[in-house]
């Protein structure tokens, strides 16, 4: 854990332990934003011994360069921290005013076969530098990690936090414990992906024995969100000129399956339920979102299933966590 500087340090550590215990903590974003707030308090009043309204309001005020959503992301953990203190009688400061959430129309990148071929070629071409252990792990892990995203629709966070004990390499089933909303679900691997995972497991075990996570870092922990973003961006930009993100493999997986099912009529519903469960959606509404990003698909489904499709087609796409 990184160093907190202000008088709030003991209370921040208590807050983090509390959130981790309740599985409501995100190392990559919450800790960073909480640390920035801590450093802000220390820089502006290094002799302070109590949290003040001015500290909270000064840090949480929306900046001219921020959208409502980016401001919400930055101050959310501070709002939660203030409420944590208030509930325990450690502060009487009012939580910050959080801007209204803006609904965004998001159109994910549509991967082409050529783009994917070039990208995975770059993944497979990662060099080992001076036999350094860190570069060996990267060369072994990156191609498998991104192929898992591509072939299963798993969330990037789910893949990062995937425990080795929750990967059944005999049956080819992933037990997803850490997910959006903390709902456990299962993913069945394609045979080709299962074989890749088996080879990776045997190889990486020789580098990081007795590892806890299926994709281990050099410190035998899990990779953070920045690792995913950095590696994807670096390799994607080497291979392609278009903009894309690692999370869009999940969209690609859903859309590819939906496109393959347009001729199945009423069987489509059964397949949709299976897809929804395997992607970890708590309701079919979340899966229906993908209709809106498949050109013409909703009209095709209406033609095939007539009035029975009314419950399938969403009017407004739902937000999906992107990490």
For the regions a language model picked out, list residue spans one by one.
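Conserved catalytic core of the tyrosine transesterase superfamily
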Residues: 1-323
């Amino acid at each position: 854990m990184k160093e907190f500087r202000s008088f709030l340090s003991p209370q921040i550590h208590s807050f983090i332990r509390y959130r981790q215990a309740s599985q409501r903590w995100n190392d990559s974003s919450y800790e960073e934003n909480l640390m920035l707030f801590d450093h802000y308090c220390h820089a502006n009043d290094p002799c302070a011994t109590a949290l003040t309204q001015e500290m909270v309001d000064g840090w949480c005020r929306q900046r001219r360069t921020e959208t409502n959503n980016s401001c919400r992301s930055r101050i959310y953990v501070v709002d939660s921290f203030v409420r944590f203190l208030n509930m325990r009688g450690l502060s009487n400061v009012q939580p910050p005013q959080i801007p209204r959430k803006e609904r965004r129309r998001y159109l994910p990148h549509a991967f082409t076969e050529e783009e994917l071929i070039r990208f995975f070629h770059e993944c497979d071409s990662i060099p080992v530098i001076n036999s350094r252990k860190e570069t060996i792990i990267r060369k072994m892990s990156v191609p498998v990690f991104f192929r898992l995203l591509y072939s299963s629709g798993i969330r990037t966070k789910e893949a990062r936090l995937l425990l080795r004990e929750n990967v059944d390499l005999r049956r080819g089933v992933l037990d997803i414990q850490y997910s959006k909303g903390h709902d456990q679900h299962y993913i069945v691997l394609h045979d080709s992906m299962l074989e890749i995972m088996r080879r990776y497991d045997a190889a990486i075990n020789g580098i990081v024995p007795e590892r806890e996570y299926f994709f281990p870092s050099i410190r035998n922990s899990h990779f953070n969100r920045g690792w995913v973003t950095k590696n994807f961006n670096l390799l994607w930009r080497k291979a392609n000129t278009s903009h894309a993100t690692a999370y869009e493999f999940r969209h690609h997986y859903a859309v590819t399956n939906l496109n393959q099912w347009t001729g199945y009529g009423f069987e489509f519903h059964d397949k949709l339920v299976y897809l929804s469960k395997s992607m970890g959606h708590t309701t079919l509404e979340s899966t229906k979102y993908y209709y809106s990003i498949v050109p013409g698909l909703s009209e095709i489904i209406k033609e095939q299933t007539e009035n029975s499709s009314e419950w399938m087609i969403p009017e407004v796409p739902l937000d999906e966590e992107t990490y």
